[in-house]
């Protein structure tokens, strides 16, 4: 069976811009989406970590989903973050999102804070997938959620017909094992920009990226080089990207991305608390590395 995300190797985990009144700035948001698509991005993850999902209200998320579909207008895939550590609420919210025409899939994070075991997480994702009108992309990010799905658990979930991919933010070894053993129609993405070369070179699906806000063309060139068997060029592209990735994650995300946009002439506002904006010295340090 063909996966609807097949050949979607670069997705941006897009920021949520805010205006001076701390409301979502949809005019700037539309500009970002158009620019990203022009630069080669093939999809977007909305209301994820980089999109400041924890500080967005339910109504803000729904409006953001609707506006995204309108702005994208079929030019790229749209994946929306609907997950939480409450299975019932996740099902209800995913169903609500599923009533918006143009959304391709839902990103569901591993349950945080309540720390279920592997059996509990398998039950969580299976129950959501059974009820969801949208295909599910698992978001396995133990660095933020504490709970980590093992390779064995992910392979069990990969057999569910409504679970189509994983955004894997874990070790190189786990990612490699998933790529090796997952069904062919189950896609293994990395959510770590620093794993982008390794993931794609090993046969993974690509990257759900933060650095692609500024380096989408470089990511696209790297993936194209790998597709063409030119690993020397791809490695060079990655060596260019990698130190810039480190700089963009030198402070809590998405504060660096927002600071760089503002310094570059696009005011996307500041993060909502508890993430603080960067000061001038912090931004200067990042800009010296990025050289935009």
From Swiss-Prot:
Keyword Kinase: no
Subcellular location: Cytoplasm
Entry-linked InterPro entries: Aldolase_TIM, DapA, DapA-like, Schiff_base-form_aldolases_AS
Pathway listed: Amino-acid biosynthesis; L-lysine biosynthesis via DAP pathway; (S)-tetrahydrodipicolinate from L-aspartate: step 3/4
A GO CC term attached to the entry: cytosol
Subunit relationships: Homotetramer; dimer of dimers.
Protein's name according to its UniProt entry: 4-hydroxy-tetrahydrodipicolinate synthase
Species of provenance: Oenococcus oeni (strain ATCC BAA-331 / PSU-1)
Gene: dapA
